[in-house]
Structures are given as structure tokens and as C-alpha cells.
Amino acid sequence: MSFDQLHRYLFNQAHVRGELVRLENSYQSILDSYAYPPVIQKLLGELMAATSLLTATLKFEGDIALQLQSDGPVNYAVINGTHDQQLRGVARWDESLAELPTDFSQLFTKGILVITITPEDGERYQGMVALDKPTLAECIESYFQQSEQLATKVILRTQQTDSGAKACGMFLQILPTSSQATATTDTGFEHLAKLTETIKNEELFSLPAEDILYRLYHQEEIEVYPPADIIFKCSCSRERSANALAAVEKAELLDIVATEGAIKMNCQYCHREYRFDEIDVHAIHAGTFAMDTQNDQ
């Protein structure tokens, strides 16, 4: 049984599209990058599943980011995903707290969900919705109802065991081209949403995807597309870090090297550290750094 895959399907008679995503290795890679407490682990799993689901709705090459921001215990959490299902993410919270609240609404004070879509060609689009619902899934449903007036159902669940972590998600939405697209009370959609709500955790986390879809929708006319593989992939590199340093005055960089012994840059997503010494600084500002560092660390 394969996790780290997204399955897309279509209800031909109801003009509704659906998605099922299950994450394991890709999710665990994010958790391994930092010592996140259980509450944050669960949050990142739900956010990662949601990002994968929404990434699959893109009609172009590009990426999408789901970011939660607030003045509460969780400052922000973000997952970035590309059109080909490469995901990465990070969260920041008040680490001075001895214990974080487990209730979603208590994690975010004056919180907002920001969804940013960035095509490789074209203008970036950004939408937002308040984090004023009991769950992240309901906040995402609210986003689609407000911004696109599309009936949408989202299910997000996580599982933590001694053998590792898993995150799953399901997504139903009336097709934008459907005549019922703006009818949030469409009976066909409501019927499918109620069927989807019957999914049990043990089914989501243990059954093959084909069995899940059959159990839920065996009486429906459904077309299933080939699955898409999902991986954790950070876009950081030594060269990109060097490009950022090129915008800083050379003298300032040399002062840091003289004081600290080296310039240290850490990726906020994978927490990989890149170090630059005096020779690197001279190469960066001479425009020869890429040539000098073909054997990247």
C-alpha cells in the first residue's frame, strides 16, 4: 500500500471532483527537521494535506502556499507546494509556553489563513479568510464559499504512532463549469459530502486508496485518474544563499567573518546550515562564487 500519493477522481453524473491524499514519508521529513510539539505536528500534518489537495486544483505550472498567521500561541505555520507535488513547510510558535492548547481556535488569536498562488508565468494571486471556525478544514471550506462561491467539503486527519506519523485529507468540490457551481446547497453534492464524512480513521490510514473509494462511492459513477507521487523537497541551496549575501556590502560580510569565524545561514524549512568563509565572500562579490563551488556541500 502506497502512501505519499494524491488520487484525483470525478463524479460524472454529479459534476463534482474529488481528491484523496495520504502522506507518510513526506510528512515525517517535515517533522524530522525540528522538534515540534505534538500539537504543532498535528497542525502541520493537516496543513500539508490541505496544501497537497489545493495544489492538485491548479490549472498551470507554479506553486501554492497555505499560511496561518496570528497573534496567538502559534505565530505562523506555512506549507509550500508545487504543481508537481513537492512540499515543504515550517511553523513558529511561542516556545516559552509550557503547554500549547489543543483546541484549534485557541491556537490562533485574530488569525487568518492566507492562500498564495504563484504561476510560473503570470501574476500572483492571494486570498485570505479568518481563522474563525473550529477546524482548519472548515476554514478552508469557508474560503472557497466566500472567494469562489463553490460548494466544498474538506476532511483533514492525522495519526501519530510509535512507527511514525501519517496525514490524510479528502476534498470534494462542485466543478466551476457546472450550472450548480454556485449552489452551496446542491443536493447531489450534499449526498456525496455525507458519504465522504462516513470515512473512519482506521480506513483512511490502513486501507489501499482503491478500497477507500469503493467503500465510500461504490454506488456512484466515478472516474479515477492515475495517482501523483508526493515528496518533501526544500528549494534551499548554497548557491541561493550566496545570492542573498551578494546584496550585502562586502565589508559588512568580512566583518562578520572576522568576528564569528564564518557566516552561517540556516534554511527555515529544512534547517540545513550553509557556512561561508572569507574566500567565499570575495568570490561572491567577484561574481565567481558559482564557479568556485561546483562541488556543493
From Swiss-Prot:
Places the protein is found: Cytoplasm
Family classification: Belongs to the HSP33 family.
One protein family per Pfam: HSP33
Role, per record: Redox regulated molecular chaperone. Protects both thermally unfolding and oxidatively damaged proteins from irreversible aggregation. Plays an important role in the bacterial defense system toward oxidative stress.
Cross-referenced InterPro entries: Heat_shock_Hsp33, Heat_shock_Hsp33_C, Heat_shock_Hsp33_N, Hsp33_helix_hairpin_bin_dom_sf
Molecular function in Gene Ontology: protein folding chaperone; unfolded protein binding
NCBIfam families membership: PRK00114.1
Lineage: Bacteria, Pseudomonadati, Pseudomonadota, Gammaproteobacteria, Alteromonadales
Keywords: Chaperone, Cytoplasm, Disulfide bond, Redox-active center, Zinc
GO biological process: protein refolding
GO CC annotation terms, alphabetical: cytoplasm
Protein name: 33 kDa chaperonin
Post-translational modification: Under oxidizing conditions two disulfide bonds are formed involving the reactive cysteines. Under reducing conditions zinc is bound to the reactive cysteines and the protein is inactive.
Domain of life, source organism: Bacteria
HAMAP family for the chain: HslO
Species assigned in the record: Pseudoalteromonas atlantica (strain T6c / ATCC BAA-1087)
Disulphide-bridged cysteine pairs: C234-C236, C267-C270
